């Protein structure tokens, strides 16, 4: 026994003579935000109703061709303002899918802020006038690369498959099947790659002639192609106004039986500046909560169109708050998110596909089949994105060669994917196994010597 004790001591000495590698300590972070799901006619974090109390965010506008979530200096500067305002969601219209977004998404998470993300950009999008040509494998590769990049973050709330592709021109409705096919493809990609089932939907223009048809179209047909939510951009409440004067009461009435969550993807009329944002009072009350899950104010920075609550000065290092910044901050404080379910129905239901008329030219619920070259992405992934400097996808790559069968986009995990968006586990300390192994070796030798 004395021999064993001496051998054990020697083994411990050998192990302690090899110091354990010192790992760089990661900065302490807030716990991950709970993921948001779409169920019934509302959004939820666990069993709690979630309301979007947010703002649209794209410094430089669409012509700026920049990604605010890849620029750490810019996003940190603006996230401080978001936190001060009290928003819980931002919408970003364009990102560079060749860049990392880890730092800015973590900063947003630490601030308690979710992201609603458009998957398109001016170079990679559905062309409303040439939808068949623009729905191609090159386009979908960019879309899937964006989805893959942002599905790993717990605070990615939702994806938009399109924004105002359908407008007041009747022939623009012919693009609807291609946007809906993109919705189907994103949902299938998430499932096939084993990624989190992030809600996917469409942001519509508020066009009275086809608003109802558009909403029904994205909620009809087989489940694999139906949207998870519907959103539209609304500027009809122009102060001084009211719930009834603005017509918002009718927009509640008209969607009372709609079977999906709805929110306003843009709101905030600028007819009589400065805006007071008093309509938030209705949006956060039982005037609307049974049907609507909040909305996103348009927009954060002034971009020459009359909107914006801050001015970005010079090299964008300074931010000047306007009166509207203070007004929005006051409104968000004055009208908190409701508690409870808000009267939302817990079950979802599909709509009947709209029939053809002068304002709606889609005559079938059939969708284009995914282009053959894009099918491989479902199992092998999209790979690196082309970014904002890519060649673009208009009239590029293979297009759809036929009509898809209903249910063809049903998902089944065919890849292990990345189902969790949490931080990696810390490196395992192997010293225990080293001690155990060496002790075992000396024990064996000691036994043989006895």
Regions found by a protein language model. Give the residues of each.
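Active-site groove signature of glycoside hydrolases
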Residues: 143-174, 201
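N-terminal carbohydrate-binding accessory modules
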Residues: 2-8, 12-84
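Hydrophobic faces of well-ordered beta-strands that scaffold small-molecule active sites
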Residues: 53-55, 90-92, 115-119, 157-161, ...
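Fungal extracellular Ser/Thr-rich, low-complexity intrinsically disordered regions
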Residues: 16-46, 300, 304-307, 311, ...
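Short, acidic/polar
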Residues: 64-82, 139-147, 210-223, 276-283
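Cleavable C-terminal sorting propeptides in eukaryotic secreted/cell-surface proteins
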Residues: 419-450
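Aromatic-lined substrate-binding rim segments of carbohydrate-active enzymes
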Residues: 74-126, 179-199
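Noncatalytic carbohydrate-binding groove/subsite architecture in carbohydrate-active enzymes
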Residues: 171-283
